[in-house]
């Protein structure tokens, strides 16, 4: 196991690393000053760029957010990664609305899946949604996600951030 290997060779690594308490390593000023590129994983991301890092179906805790909040808010570049699908390809990890929000569109610079990279900087919500669908969603779910977005745009009175909550909540059931 790699952990055992690390500790067996600790002297080899001793002069190459510095261990600090979380109050220092996760301090916003330290993160900003170093120009950190933060890469965090998510359970799901929505088409607008909000991410869920901690809850399955919005209610079952998978893991905590840890230091991801500190890093994504203060990093020079904040990247989130996920697979495009779960449950052997039957469930999209790119959804109309995440079931729980850990990180918002205001903190995320890029989203990456095995399908591609969506650089979200400077884009409005509809531009972000189209880019995430086209670059990050699995091809088998892209049509349904575009249909959701088109319907939300045509029915939502707030065109700058079109959301159809009922359709978003039913998205997984429809798959």
Segments from the language model and where they lie:
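Conserved phosphate- and dinucleotide-binding cores of soluble alpha/beta proteins
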Residues: 1-175
């Amino acid at each position: 196991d790699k952990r055992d290997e690390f500790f067996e060779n600790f002297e080899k690594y001793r002069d190459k690393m510095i261990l600090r308490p979380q109050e220092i390593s996760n301090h916003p000023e330290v993160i900003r000053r170093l120009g950190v590129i933060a890469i965090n994983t998510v359970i799901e991301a929505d088409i607008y760029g909000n991410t869920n890092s901690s809850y399955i179906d919005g209610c079952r805790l998978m893991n905590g957010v840890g230091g991801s909040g500190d890093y994504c808010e203060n990093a020079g570049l904040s990247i989130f990664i996920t697979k495009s699908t779960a449950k052997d390809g039957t469930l999209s990890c790119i959804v109309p609305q995440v079931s729980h929000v850990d990180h918002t569109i205001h903190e995320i610079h890029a989203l990456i899946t095995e399908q591609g990279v969506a650089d979200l900087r400077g884009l409005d919500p509809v531009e972000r949604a189209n880019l995430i669908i086209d670059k990050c969603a699995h091809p088998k779910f892209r049509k349904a996600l575009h249909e959701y977005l088109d319907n939300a745009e045509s029915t939502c009175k707030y065109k700058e951030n079109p959301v159809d909550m009922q359709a978003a909540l039913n998205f997984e059931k429809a798959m």
